[in-house]
Amino acid sequence: MADVDRPKITGLGGVFYVVADPEATRAWYRDVLGLDGEHGPQMNWSEELGDKPYSLISHFKDDQYIKPGKGGFMINLRVNDLDGFIAMLTAKGVEVLDSVEEGYGKFAWVLDPNGVRIELWQQCSAPAD
């Protein structure tokens, strides 16, 4: 069977978690991150830098990478201009916890209103296949 014909996962369908105030959380994702949709925050995949759109599922032995986030998970969102996005978040009163640049991209972290850690990632080049 050719890879094209093989059943495969095609992307991240969603992130689902329990919060105390769903409407306030949805408003934060809409007003602060610019994500909105009929059924909640939504984003459409696009091909950037000539690569195939993708999401990564990572498993960690402990929660050190996710801290100070709560709930044992983190959401990674790709952005096209991390510096500009950080400036926009800062103007809206969002605290940026940290930012770094690695060989494969630039990263910054914030917490949503429920304490969920959000990792913002600007990819610097197409990933290796």
Regions found by a protein language model. Name each.
Residues 33-71, 110-113, 117-125:
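Conserved short beta-strand elements that form part of the metal-binding/catalytic scaffold
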Residues 17, 75-77:
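Short, well-ordered beta-strand elements within core beta-sheets of diverse protein domains
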Residues 12-13, 70-74:
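Eukaryotic phosphotyrosine signaling hubs
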Residues 6-10, 16-56, 91:
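Core segments of cupin and vicinal oxygen chelate
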